[in-house]
Swiss-Prot record:
A GO-annotated cellular component: ribosome
GO MF, one annotated term: rRNA binding
Ranges in coiled-coil conformation: none
Gene3D superfamilies assigned: 3.30.1370.30, 3.30.1490.10
Source organism: Methanocella arvoryzae (strain DSM 22066 / NBRC 105507 / MRE50)
Alphabetized InterPro entries for the sequence: Ribosomal_uS8 (IPR000630), Ribosomal_uS8_CS (IPR047863), Ribosomal_uS8_sf (IPR035987)
Self-association and partners: Part of the 30S ribosomal subunit.
Family: Belongs to the universal ribosomal protein uS8 family.
GO biological process: translation
Protein name: Small ribosomal subunit protein uS8
Keyword rRNA-binding among record annotations: yes
Protein role: One of the primary rRNA binding proteins, it binds directly to 16S rRNA central domain where it helps coordinate assembly of the platform of the 30S subunit.
Amino acid sequence: MVLMDPLANALSVIKNAETTGKTDCVIDPASKIIGNVLKVMQDQGYVGEFEFVDNGKAGQLKVKLIGKINKCGVVKPRFAVGKTEMEKWEKRYLPARNFGTLILTTSKGVMSHYDAAKMGIGGEILAYVY
């Protein structure tokens, strides 16, 4: 079976594990973009520690869940967002103001929309979590 979108698969695994009340999950295969998205989610307090495990193929990521995710998913197509358009996309993907996080890929790396707004840069929306 071929995975069309590994990031969507990873967020689906996390959401399903959170829904069933598990304390950890394994994301297979691992990639840099998934690791960077998990780092942003960890910085925002949605997941605990995570570690890369080499299985001889692409590797796996073991993620500790802390039960704070209500919903998460990818944004397709990957919309380009200017620094002045952030609020429009917050209204579209997040349930309330200052609740949840949009995860962006920018020229400075993967970051939350809060950090991108502080730096005054835009990017492309990868995912949302709340």
